Structures are given as structure tokens and as C-alpha cells.
Amino acid sequence: MGFVLVPKSDFQIPLEADTIRPDLFEGLDLDEIRSLQVYEGNIKRPLGEFFEIAETPHADQLIRIDGDVSRVKYIGSGMKSGKIIINGDVGLQLGCEMKGGEIEVNGNVSSWIGMEMHGGTIKINGNAGDYVGCAYRGEWRGMKGGKIIIQGNAGNNIGGGMMAGEIYIGGDAGNFCGIRMNGGEITVRGDAGRAPGAEMVSGIIKIHGRISSLLPGFKEISTFKEDGSLMILFKGDLSEKNPEGNLYINYNKNLHILENETDEGRVITKKGIKVIYNSGSTIREGQIIKGGNKLTDDYIDECARCCISPEDYKLLGEPENVVVSSHGNEVVLRAVEDPGIQMGTIFIPRGIWANVLTPPYTESTGSPMYKGVPVYLRKASQGERILSAEELVEEYGVGK
């Protein structure tokens, strides 16, 4: 015996309905199902207050929801068996910690679907939000098994901390696809945003469309054909210990990435040369600010610098200072030629000067917003000087 649920009205307050599960409904009569508890805000109420519930003879362990449940969270959370069909849009955390069974949505879903799921299948015949198959905040281990299929587009941080399982996206994906991935496979048939595979140590990511930027921690290994497309395999992320991650991208759709591997034809525009900005804390920086004081000459000397590859340093005319600009902001930094920096990238110690360039996107399981940012780099003129930490705080409002 299956059941059909129809919302009685629009949900004014989000509902937490982790009791909508086929394995929990099994063996219960209609009155018992209507009495199952859900949370409206912080108040427990019976499920029957919000849904018309009827039996259907078509299938056992089936729940069909007809209507908009975009403000209902945790549907199918922890389910072990059975099937849920939703004809409408769905809210947050659909199928989180799911262990078995199947969920199919004929509509769009919000963020955090399939969080830390262990098994089963989630199929979305529409679009999905951020953090598909991701880890909970404060946790590093995401999806551990099962399969998520999204026929449309998906948002940022897909498969964050993923350990095993499969995620398939038929459309486009946002930034940081496969961040901190440690196993499993992600396939994106469309385009993806910046820095796919950031901090991944294992697993497979295949992107058949265009990516915005590639992190310098990925090394090209080989080129081959797959489904009629020429693909390139990269290994990484080499910024991690013993990385075994495999990132595949489409050759013909990512010539803008591959062209950065050579200085042939690179030109300096009015803005300068386009490079990829990365940042991170340094040991010296930690020693300086251990006492909590960042407003020192030593701090400026360590953090107000831009490490540049020898090729780009020479292309810019071996400058003393450079101007780095992004998103309408710019900062003057001391230029440092560094053979350890890959051509087409720069490194700025993470601090107040780096914060001027950091995009506002900060929703992540860590701090990858400091990686893979496209910026412009040019030689500073005589009148452009390095601002102190206090001046930057006053001008841009960046935190200390």
C-alpha cells in the first residue's frame, strides 16, 4: 500500500518533515500517519495538519507528494527503502543521510540534497541548489555512497568532501565542484565555475563543458577521446599531501585555460596581464601576528607582497611594485620574482591586502574563496604606493 500527500495550503513557516519516509509509513494506518510529528518552526505538530493523506493501491512503500513543498525540509532524511515521488519543487536537505530507496522530483530542489548519504538514488528532473552530496558544516566527510542525478543545473560546492558514490549533472555546475573530494565520481555535462577539484585528494571529476579557471595545483597527464570529445586528464590537487585526484576537462572548450600554459601571444592590456590569484597563510605571517598585532612594518613586509613567476615578472618589465585588481578593487604590492610560482598565477599571503581582492562568495566548507580568482596584474606607476593596513581598512572596510 502506498500513500498520496497533498499540501492543504501554502507553508507560511518552513516545515521540518523527516518523518515523511516510506520505511516509517510501512505498517501504519492513515490515522497513525496523520499523527506523525513534524516541526513548524520550533513547535511540534501532526503531519495531518499540513497534508491531505490518502491511500493508493498502486505500489508498496511508495509516497507520492503532489504540490509545492519548497518550504518543507528533510523529506526522505535517513530513509532506508521505498520510493518517494514529488510532483513539485522541494526544500532543503532532501534525502540527507539516506541509506537506501529512491527519491524522484519532477521539479526543482533547494540546497543540501543528499548530504552525507550512504546509499539509494536521488533523481531531480530539474535544477538543484548548492552543496549537493556535501558534508555538514564542520564535517569533512560528505556523500559516502549512492547516486544523485540532476537533469538540470546545480549550484556551488557540489560533492564537497565526497567519499564515494556518483553525482551526475546534466547541465551546468557552479564554483568549487568537487571541493575536498576524497573519492567517488562527479560528471558535469555542461559548464562549471572556477576552481573545480580544489583541495581534492582522490576521486574523479569529468567536466564536458567550459570551466572558468583551473587551479595551479593540477598537472596535465594525458589527452584522449571520450564520447567523441577530446578530453585532458589532470592530476591534483598538488597543494594537498599525496593527491590522487583525476580531473578531466574538454580540450576544445577550454583553450583559454590551456593558452595560459605558454607565454606565446600574451599581451599587456591597459589593465595588465590576466592571471590567477591564490592566497594562503605563511609561517612568517603566523609568527608576526602571534601577539595579535597586524599593524607593524614586519607585517606589511610579509603580507603586502605579490609572488610572480619569472616569465610574468620579465613580461611586466621586472617591476618594483605591482597593482593587482579584481571586482573593481585594486591593491599595490611589492613585486617578488619567485621560481616556485607557475606562469599565469600569483601568490599573495593571506591578510588585509589579499582581502581587498577576495570575492564576496564565502559560503564553503573552508576557505577556497582564496583560490583560483581571475585578476589583472600590471606594473605600478611612480605615484602608486603600498597602503598601510590602517589605510586599507579605512578605504575598503576589510577586516583586521
Swiss-Prot record:
A GO molecular function term, named singly, is: formylmethanofuran dehydrogenase activity
Q: Which GO terms describe its biological process?
A: methanogenesis, from carbon dioxide
Q: What activates or inhibits this protein?
A: Inactivated by cyanide.
Classification via InterPro entries: Asp_de-COase-like_dom_sf (IPR009010), FmdC/FwdD_MopB-bd (IPR041717), Formylmethanofuran_DH_csu/dsu (IPR012048), Formylmethanofuran_DH_suC (IPR017550), Glu_synth_asu_C_sf (IPR036485), MoPterin_dinucl-bd_dom (IPR006657)
sequence repeats mapped onto the chain: 76-88, 95-107, 114-126, 140-152, 159-171, 178-190, 197-209
Keywords from UniProt, A to Z, are: Methanogenesis, Oxidoreductase, Repeat
- Substrates-to-products reaction catalysed: N-formylmethanofuran + 2 oxidized [2Fe-2S]-[ferredoxin] + H2O = methanofuran + 2 reduced [2Fe-2S]-[ferredoxin] + CO2 + H(+)
| Enzyme Commission (EC) number | 1.2.7.12
- Region labeled 7 X 13 AA repeats of [GW]-X-X-M-X-X-G-X-I-X-[IV]-X-G — which residues? 76-209
Factors inducing expression = By growth on molybdenum, under anaerobic conditions.
Tree of life domain: Archaea
The metabolic or biological pathway listed in the UniProt record of this protein is: One-carbon metabolism; methanogenesis from CO(2); 5,10-methenyl-5,6,7,8-tetrahydromethanopterin from CO(2): step 1/3
| Function according to Swiss-Prot or TrEMBL | Catalyzes the reversible oxidation of CO(2) and methanofuran (MFR) to N-formylmethanofuran (CHO-MFR). Can only oxidize formylmethanofuran. This enzyme is oxygen-labile.
Q: Which NCBIfam families does this one have?
A: one_C_dehyd_C
Q: Which family does it belong to?
A: In the N-terminal section; belongs to the FwdC/FmdC family. In the C-terminal section; belongs to the molybdenum dinucleotide binding protein family.
Q: Partners and quaternary state?
A: Consists of five subunits; FmdA, FmdB, FmdC, FmdD, and FmdE.
Q: What is this protein called?
A: Molybdenum-containing formylmethanofuran dehydrogenase 1 subunit C
